[in-house]
Amino acid sequence: MSKYQKKSEAELKRTLTKLQFDVTQNAHTEPPYINEYNRNFEKGIYVDITSGEPLFISTDKFKSGCGWPAFSKPIDKNLIANYRDESHGMIRTEVRAKNSDSHLGHVFNDGPSELGGLRYCINSAALKFIPFEEMEKLGYKDYIHLFKNK
């Protein structure tokens, strides 16, 4: 059993903003460009807002121009679940956090080829950023090694 578990619906409603709840629990999409992490390129990790599980690392984040944080890959592909999404008259691949089943965003195959060709377009409202300097203090010491040689 993972140490990162989704909270109850009541706890999520109490601790998340309405936007965070709607994005993660109801698969809504936050507005582009004016969200919290679109322009954040500080060193650190991005964790699931509902469970605290590390999902993305700042060294895999890139400027995509899409209006949402974009990553070339997750920290570990086993932390992410992909689902076919046919909503809004489009066919896309929805990205969810595997342990918490929280909606994160979508993945597209139009990312930079030198980074693997994928673009994980993720809602800021589904994430919490942990600055590198605070990772150990906040319980993410096991992920500091990911920044070596980067």
Swiss-Prot record:
Which Gene Ontology BP annotations are present?
A: protein repair; response to oxidative stress
Q: Which keywords describe this protein according to UniProt? A: Oxidoreductase
Q: From the UniProt annotation, give the residues forming the signal peptide.
A: none
The catalytic residues are: 121 (nucleophile)
| Residue ranges of every copy of the MsrB domain listed in the record | 9-132
Which is an annotated GO molecular function term of this record?
peptide-methionine (R)-S-oxide reductase activity
The record, for InterPro entries, names:
Met_Sox_Rdtase_MsrB, Met_Sox_Rdtase_MsrB_dom, Mss4-like_sf
PROSITE patterns with a match to the protein in the record: MSRB
Q: Tell me which Gene3D superfamilies the record gives.
A: Peptide methionine sulfoxide reductase
Enzyme Commission number(s) from the entry: 1.8.4.12
Q: Which family does it belong to?
A: Belongs to the MsrB Met sulfoxide reductase family.
The cross-references to PANTHER family, in alphabetical order and at most eight, read: METHIONINE SULFOXIDE REDUCTASE (PTHR10173), PEPTIDE METHIONINE SULFOXIDE REDUCTASE MSRA_MSRB (PTHR10173:SF59)
Q: What is this protein called?
A: Peptide methionine sulfoxide reductase MsrB
The organism of origin for this protein? Mycoplasma genitalium (strain ATCC 33530 / DSM 19775 / NCTC 10195 / G37)
The upper taxonomy is: Bacteria, Bacillati, Mycoplasmatota, Mycoplasmoidales, Mycoplasmoidaceae
Q: Its gene?
A: msrB
